[in-house]
Every structure is written in structure tokens, then in C-alpha cells.
């Protein structure tokens, strides 16, 4: 009898160790994501917008080499985080018409390339605003209740990890259309306040474990370097980076206050410093190129300009921080996720 108990204990220990190794966390039923292209896994595919990438060479390093609508050579952070949580290797786009009810259980992404906290951003780009993403989230919860019951919906709301990722399109594009109303500082503050309002609304809908990404050093993406960084030097667009820093300076303490005010956990996730350090010191992270993308010549190549007719696309995208002139490669995303996820998840679960 003692031997049987000992063997059972060893089996349980082995199972638990394997679960940890595989990234399985039974306390996290799903990953729910809102935001822009960083987390979009194909929601724009059927929209009347030019901001699409469901064609080669996008997806060349994705399983099967499929161009699924992810703005990368492979997977994006929503996929990588879902895998790290032990949920799935890829996170489905909510707008995917082939989704079955059971596909909703591990989570979805509502993210749409080109959107932002400023409602004008999505309107200009003809994409899904973050506010409309909340409407789709309500629909998602209704589907969960209908197919799997109230208790399952309650479990997803209370224990899932919710991620909100936006601001780059607002800062880099929409500000130019709003400059008659705001200076750079006041616009960054407006965006941060809008982000806090979004989190409040998400919390009202039942979400209790929410992480919000900081703005990134969008002034250092290859396209910004090419257009604003000087013809020969191609340095970062520092005024744009300063706007991102102002957004972060406003957002971080506001989310800390919200975390104290509301039940659950609300986290500010500092992505800016990690990505900026990668761009400034690429060799430190195993990259060769940080100032241009792999696709095409990597200077202004994005969306339809990054296509299979372009003969200049690199053969080894993992040596580049950026895949196209705006979006990181899968390997760069993996470095960011590995550097940040465990640190912040430990504050939630």
C-alpha cells in the first residue's frame, strides 16, 4: 500500500512538472485581447480597408507558411502569450467566420490593425475601433453563455487574462489630423485618459485581470526613420518617441490608481523600455538589423508594398528586429514576451 501511494505521488509530481514545462496554467481559462496590429490575427481580412496582410510573404514563417492576416513573418504576441499560458499555439481572430463555439473557450483577439484609442483613428483607416471591439466582446460573452452556460462565462470573466494594446496609430498618424486641437503633450494625455476609460468600461463588463501595454518607441520603426530620421542618418523620430513617453507617464500612475480603486488586478506593462533596448543594442539580443525591415528593402515596405513580387525580401527574418517597415518579426516578439510575461503574470496569478 505504501509503495502504491509513493508511486502515485511520483506520478502526480511528474504530471505537475510537465504542466509547468509546457506552460500550462489551469487558473487561466482564456486569453482575451483588444487593440491594434500587434495583436491582430486576421480581423481585418474581410473589412473594406487597405490595412491587410493576408497574402505572401506575410506568414512565411507561420506554421504551414500561411498568410493569415498577421502583420509579421509568423506569429504575433497574442499567439505567443496564448502558447506560454498553455492555452493554444495560436489565438483566433474573433471575426474569423470559420470559428466554432468550442474555438471561443480558450480566448480570442478582437484587435484590428490601424485602430487606436482616438475614435478618429479607426474611422480614418476603416477598421474596428477599440470601442466597437467592446461591443464584439459583449457578443462573445453572450455566445459563451448560450453554448456553455452562465458559470463558464463567469469563470472566463473572473479568471482570464485580458490584454489591451494600442496607441501607436494614434501617435504616428492621427495626431497630424488633430494638431489643430491638441499640442503633442495634450494629445498624448488625451490618449492615456481614453485608455483608462476603456479599461473602466472593460471592467464594467466583468473583466477582472487586465494588462495594458505601454506605448512603444514608435519613432524608431523603420518607416519613421526613413521619413523623419534624415536621409543619411535615418535616426529615430524623437518628437514621436517623446509623445509615446508622455503617454506612458500619464498612463502608468492612472492605471495604478485604477487598480487600487477597482476590484481585481489592473497592470501597466512597460514594453517601451524592452523594445527600445533591443533597437539600440540588437546584438545583445541576437539580432543583426534594427533599422530596417526584412520585407523588401525594409524602408517603406508595409502591407501591399510587402508582397511576393518584391525581390528584396531577406531570407532570414529572425536576424531582423522588424519584419516589415512597421512591425517586429516573430522572433523579436518572442524576445519581448519572454522578457515581460512572467514578470507581470506573477502580479496577477
Curated annotation (Swiss-Prot):
Give the UniProt record's GO annotations in the biological process aspect: lipid catabolic process
Fetch the CDD domains from UniProt: SGNH_plant_lipase_like (cd01837)
> Which Enzyme Commission number(s) are on file for it?
3.1.1.-
Q: Name its cellular compartments.
A: Secreted
Residues linked to a glycan = 25, 316
Native source species: Arabidopsis thaliana (Mouse-ear cress)
Q: Which residues form the signal peptide?
A: 1-19
Keywords, A to Z, come to: Glycoprotein, Hydrolase, Lipid degradation, Lipid metabolism, Secreted, Signal
Q: Where is the active site?
A: 37, 324, 327
What is any Pfam family matched here? Lipase_GDSL
GO CC terms in record: extracellular region
Q: Which domain of life is it from?
A: Eukaryota
Gene Ontology MF annotations: lipase activity
Q: What is this protein called?
A: GDSL esterase/lipase At1g58525
DNA damage as UniProt keyword:
no
Q: Which residues form a coiled coil?
A: none
Family as reported in the entry's similarity comment: Belongs to the 'GDSL' lipolytic enzyme family.
Amino acid at each position: 500500500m505504501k509503495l502504491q501511494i509513493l508511486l502515485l505521488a511520483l506520478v502526480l509530481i511528474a504530471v505537475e512538472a510537465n504542466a509547468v514545462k509546457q506552460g500550462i496554467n489551469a487558473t487561466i481559462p482564456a486569453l482575451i485581447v483588444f487593440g491594434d496590429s500587434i495583436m491582430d490575427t486576421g480581423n481585418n481580412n474581410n473589412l473594406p480597408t487597405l490595412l491587410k496582410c493576408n497574402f505572401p510573404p506575410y506568414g512565411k514563417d507561420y506554421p504551414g507558411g500561411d498568410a493569415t492576416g498577421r502583420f509579421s513573418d509568423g506569429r504575433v504576441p497574442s499567439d505567443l502569450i496564448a502558447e506560454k499560458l498553455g492555452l493554444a499555439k495560436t489565438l483566433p481572430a474573433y471575426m474569423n467566420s470559420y470559428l466554432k463555439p468550442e474555438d471561443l473557450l480558450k480566448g480570442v483577439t478582437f484587435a484590428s490593425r490601424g485602430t487606436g484609442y482616438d475614435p478618429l483613428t479607426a474611422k480614418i483607416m476603416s477598421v474596428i475601433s477599440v470601442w466597437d471591439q467592446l461591443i464584439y466582446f459583449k457578443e462573445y460573452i453572450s455566445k459563451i453563455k448560450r453554448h456553455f452556460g452562465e458559470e463558464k462565462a463567469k469563470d472566463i470573466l473572473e479568471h482570464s487574462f485580458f490584454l489591451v494594446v494600442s496607441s501607436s496609430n494614434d501617435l504616428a498618424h492621427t495626431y497630424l489630423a488633430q494638431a489643430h486641437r491638441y499640442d503633442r503633450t495634450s494629445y498624448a494625455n488625451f490618449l492615456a485618459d481614453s485608455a483608462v476609460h476603456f479599461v473602466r468600461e472593460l471592467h464594467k463588463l466583468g473583466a477582472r485581470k487586465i494588462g495594458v501595454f505601454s506605448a512603444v518607441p514608435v519613432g524608431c520603426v523603420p518607416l519613421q526613420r526613413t521619413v523623419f530620421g534624415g536621409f543619411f542618418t535615418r535616426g529615430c523620430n524623437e518628437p514621436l518617441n517623446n509623445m509615446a513617453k508622455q503617454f506612458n507617464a500619464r498612463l502608468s500612475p492612472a492605471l495604478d490608481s485604477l487598480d487600487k480603486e477597482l476590484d481585481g488586478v489592473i497592470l501597466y506593462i512597460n514594453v517601451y523600455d524592452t523594445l527600445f533596448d533591443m533597437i539600440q543594442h540588437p546584438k545583445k539580443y541576437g539580432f543583426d538589423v534594427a533599422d530596417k525591415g526584412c520585407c523588401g528593402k525594409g524602408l517603406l515596405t508595409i502591407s501591399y508594398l510587402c508582397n511576393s513580387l518584391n525581390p528584396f525580401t531577406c531570407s532570414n527574418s529572425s536576424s531582423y528586429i522588424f519584419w516589415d517597415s512597421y512591425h517586429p518579426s516573430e522572433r523579436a516578439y518572442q524576445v519581448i514576451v519572454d522578457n515581460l510575461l512572467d514578470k507581470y503574470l506573477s502580479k496577477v496569478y
